[in-house]
């Protein structure tokens, strides 16, 4: 899901 991808993107920023 796109939502999961968004969460992964945020986690990558951290």
Swiss-Prot record:
Q: Which UniProt keywords apply?
A: Amidation, Amphibian defense peptide, Secreted
Location(s) in or outside the cell: Secreted
Q: Does the keyword Secreted apply?
A: yes
Main location per UniProt? secreted
In the UniProt record, the signal sequence range is none
Give the sites modified to Leucine amide: 14
The Gene Ontology CC terms held by the record are: extracellular region
In what tissue types does this protein appear? Expressed by the skin glands.
Q: GO annotations under biological process?
A: defense response
What does the function comment of this entry state? Answer: Lacks antibacterial activity against Gram-positive or Gram-negative bacteria.
Family named by the database record:
Belongs to the frog skin active peptide (FSAP) family. Brevinin subfamily.
UniProt name for this protein:
Fallaxidin-3.2.1
Task: Provide the species name.
Answer: Litoria fallax
């Amino acid at each position: 899901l796109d939502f999961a991808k968004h969460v992964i993107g945020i986690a990558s920023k951290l």
